[in-house]
Regions:
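Beta-strand segments within the central parallel beta-sheet cores of soluble alpha/beta enzyme folds
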Residues: 1, 22-28, 52-56, 130-137, ...
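Conserved catalytic cysteine-centered active-site region
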Residues: 2-51, 59-114, 151-177, 207-209, ...
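ATPase catalytic-site recognition across NTP-hydrolyzing enzymes
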Residues: 139-140, 144-152, 158
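Short acidic, glycine/serine/threonine-rich loops at helix termini
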Residues: 63-69, 144-147, 198, 217-219
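Phosphate/pyrophosphate-binding loops at sites that engage ATP/ADP/AMP, CoA/4′-phosphopantetheine
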Residues: 121-126, 230-240
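Generic structural marker for isolated residues within well-ordered, non-membrane alpha-helices
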Residues: 9, 118, 231
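Condensing-enzyme catalytic core mediating Claisen C-C bond formation in acyl metabolism
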Residues: 86-104, 134, 165-233, 237
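Active-site-proximal alpha-helical scaffold in enzymes
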Residues: 28-58, 111-145, 185-191
Length: 240
């Protein structure tokens, strides 16, 4: 949010003494951190390094809400914005939002996109708003046990449904909050693990890690959905 776009990693890590090694800054929308992890895995598997640190960080909380939400404007084709929005929102056609189910306060347009995806799921599979609420309640239930979670209060399905509406079928607890936070993963081979004096019993083995982008398709053509395609590649590589 402060315009530090080009050398974030170099500047953030230098104060901790991390310098003189390759640092790659990754921007890939909501997949930025997982893309960094994918690159780390490939780097180690190629033999280019024994140890790679993959860091995901986000800094979104500022007082200027308009500027904060404007940060998402570059997450689609800025030269064809309206057509892109229209195409995405069309996924929800056929499901009429009940009266009072849309927020009158400003929020990210991506909530409308996710709501359209939810409406498409309702139309195609008979999914209910209560089932979406059950997912949110389950996730908030898990966060109550995580001391590092942004929100740590358990919430019932009924409370999720009674919460302020955002964009039907989504209510506030179903939506991603604006956050400041970070996470990191150390990716290494056996030599790297020994160098770090790590406990092999705690190490998580990466069987497969794939990265895939979407392709032109009808919104209800789920056979060619990028998640399905990526999952099949993942299962093939991992032998699961």
């Amino acid at each position: 949010m402060d315009g530090q776009h080009m050398v974030r990693g170099q500047l953030a890590l230098r104060a901790m003494g991390v310098q003189g090694i390759p640092v790659v800054n990754v921007e890939n929308a909501c997949a930025s951190a997982s893309t960094a992890l994918h690159m780390a895995v490939q780097h180690v598997r190629s033999g280019a390094a024994d140890i790679v640190l993959a860091v995901g960080a986000e800094k979104m909380c500022i007082d200027d809400k308009a500027r904060m939400f404007a940060a998402f404007d570059g997450a689609w084709d800025v030269h064809d914005t309206e057509a892109g929005k229209e195409r995405l929102l069309a996924m929800g056609h056929g499901i009429a939002p009940p009266p009072g189910s849309q927020s009158l306060r400003p929020y990210s347009l991506f909530m409308d996109v996710y709501a359209a995806m939810g409406c498409m799921h309702m139309r195609e599979f008979g999914t209910t708003q209560q089932q979406f609420a059950a997912v949110a309640a389950k996730n908030h239930g898990h966060s109550a046990h995580n001391p590092l979670a942004q929100y740590r209060e358990a919430i019932s399905v009924e409370q999720v449904l009674a919460a302020p509406p955002i964009s039907y079928p989504l209510t506030l607890p179903m939506c991603s909050p604006v956050s400041d936070g970070a996470a990191a993963a150390i990716v290494c081979n056996e030599s790297g693990l020994k160098c770090l004096q790590g406990d092999a019993r705690r190490a998580v083995r990466v069987l497969a890690c794939v990265l895939q982008t979407g392709s032109e398709r009808a919104s209800n053509d789920l056979e060619n959905h990028l998640v399905r395609k990526a999952a099949h590649r993942l299962y093939e590589q991992s032998g699961v």
